[in-house]
């Protein structure tokens, strides 16, 4: 017998692990689509005029090779004890939370909870987060997270401008705020025409401002009561914002007790590693009357069809995707996964545990301050929580170096001071090393008391809801987390076919490095030489993304796709100003654009001019040409999505770019649909000047149930000098390098949520250039297969000139309205089959947009198709008069276990209602609640944990 080695490669990650359909299954799918090969399908789908010539050519790494490379890169980072503070602190992530939340795909692969019936677990966890924030800040309403503390401060400023009755156009910022917060506020204020006044609170003139931001405790440690300043602001009809620290509020008087209108901050030190800048969940809370002006997601309590308590996203008409160019915020993806971690940290420790941690941190700081004072050092401030500043004169460099020699980073403050911020991880050994750096080797025992006046001690209770006390034992904590995750539908259970969302595989090997200490524990403002591994990773990822997109430089700072849009538009405006063309402020945006596009343009101070869509869904070229000509020398940019939001490669994209350039504008190509382009089309080569990339879509960062995300922007060379900079680095950042000194930051950290960039880097390395291209091709195949199978049962809207869709397709459900069947009915019925609904009513009302990513197997796609075909038959029964829509399984969906076991009095069989075609029988997903009453929830708004007795609430 002759031995013949197999040609099967067990380590081929792209084809064996990431891409779902096998080669033989692809052949079957191609036959259904009506082509002989994948090459033919791509030729019929992607216009030849835009296809790239040069292939992506780097070789792939196997999983074990990837992890070995990651270990080598991680070793180049130097793990130090960072006592820099400035909004970032060492913290202990309880292993129960790391293993059961952060490393659990049931939590990290879920989508934003727009379908509440299949998101009750994470909605409860986010409601716990809101309750935690509301309790600790002393304000009644809190949102479910924002991107970072600096962004939250900027959002609070614009919120105050909307809500304030003051006629002033200036905003006061306490000079004791974190420098990165001040910088981001300046960035946000400038295009909106808001004057930013930075000064000491004693310099505040309330009549001159519409609002003020105070830091509590201050960036240099000061704890002070702002009650008097806040009262003066209110007298002048202005609003008061307090940037605060949740751990400090376990001891200190809460902002609400001072009269604050809005509180913001970061929940990072509640168990979320620093990660060289993120991701972390920022928070915002406010007075009740301001809740409708609050940006971000807001979880509320409602009831389902049986009157059972149910959670949902409340007041959604506030959000940018609905308000579009009238929006005042573009917040979309936030930081849900990190908010969930922080909420479980509070559940894990409870109010007593949190107070103990806060006391320990504070008393250690008192001991350190006393030891320094007794040795003759000049320590400030007099009132502090965890941060002190030491005057060291000309010895500053020596002290900083001595501390680093002992494995500790201190903060450089001015030219003659050193800042020290202690945290949960600080122990006696760390304190001894700090003192040793100051030449204090045998400190006298210190008497320990409060480091701030007793009048500043918190008097009110917090976290009194039983959820923060009943899970003390880890066994109960583990079961609680499991119960919540079992209520949700994430990628670990089924495909999530959301159009324009790209819910692809988030491979375990890609996720592993983010929890390694060499990556997780780095402070974003640590000396650059301590982050050589991060620098290498960021530069290499930037280089690969530039090769993929055809751009020349990449900024990794934006913390979300929407923030990337905003940063890209600011870059364009800065370019125009530098050329003496500051009058260019008009932005042309197709009416089918993502809702964040017009919202981002409005935030950048642009005037949005909406361009019509042609009947086939393309940009109406005649209308575009006319509006570009009308704008003339006022045209700043156009924003288009490619492939279009209608899921088609438009043939006229080069014409749109050419017309824009002829009138002196810049072309912004939204990268939300980049999953249909990687390896096939480079936006920078077809006329784009700038694009953002949704790394949480195309490049495998998980959605986390509503964040984290990353939205880096790629630009052509002429725009590179105008990329976002940062006060800690001194200039715009491109691929880990400073390229010039021009624009301010859009995020708190220089590289945004740096730790999750590792996921996209790992994805690119394991896929290789050929694998990335094949993933794009298979994504297009999967979408065309779905369209071909469903055509006839559903009308498929918008196809290219040769009858092909890109990576997603739009199903028209509007004809069913005559029979009384809504798109919502179809979405809820899919839950009975164990599926998340496709994107509903966007970009066309009354439609479903389906995106089956390349990671989905043919079997799973067929199961989804079976479900939709069965639903179509149920619609036909309604159309034929066999059953009324109100009595059909469509209207009663989703069906719960409670429905299954109750007396059955419905006009269809129990089997049909609860076990429709396509649904698993043994491992069936059962939604924990029936259809949620959205209107009830908004009429009876409750955004904190309801009392225990209300858990049996019944609809009135």
UniProtKB/Swiss-Prot annotation:
Known EC number: 1.4.4.2
| GO biological process terms, semicolon-separated | glycine decarboxylation via glycine cleavage system
Q: Where are the transmembrane segments?
A: none
MF (Gene Ontology): glycine binding; glycine dehydrogenase (decarboxylating) activity; pyridoxal phosphate binding
Q: Which SUPFAM superfamilies match?
A: PLP-dependent transferases
N6-(pyridoxal phosphate)lysine occurs at 697
| Cellular component per GO, a single term | glycine cleavage complex
Family listed: Belongs to the GcvP family.
Q: What does this protein do?
A: The glycine cleavage system catalyzes the degradation of glycine. The P protein binds the alpha-amino group of glycine through its pyridoxal phosphate cofactor; CO(2) is released and the remaining methylamine moiety is then transferred to the lipoamide cofactor of the H protein.
Its recorded name reads Glycine dehydrogenase (decarboxylating)
Gene behind this chain? gcvP
